[in-house]
């Protein structure tokens, strides 16, 4: 069994995809992962990513957002 903690959910303004971010703690060993769930209509894309991947992905997205005009 694993523990699932919701972190954030939102809908993308252009495209309407529903995005959910969840922390997943696996019962065996207690490994923590970040689950990214993207729903487009009836289709789901799910990524379970480790800490290093989440850090790199987050930093890249934040850097891109800072470069965009407001």
Question: Where in the sequence are the language-model features?
Answer:
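Positively charged, low-complexity terminal tracts
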Residues: 1-70
């Amino acid at each position: 069994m694993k523990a699932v903690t919701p972190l954030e959910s939102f809908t993308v303004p252009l495209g309407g995809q529903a995005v959910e971010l969840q922390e997943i703690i696996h019962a065996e060993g207690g490994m923590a992962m970040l689950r990214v769930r993207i729903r487009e209509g009836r289709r789901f894309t799910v990524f379970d990513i480790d800490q290093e991947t989440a850090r790199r992905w987050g930093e890249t997205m934040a850097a891109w957002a800072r470069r965009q005009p407001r």
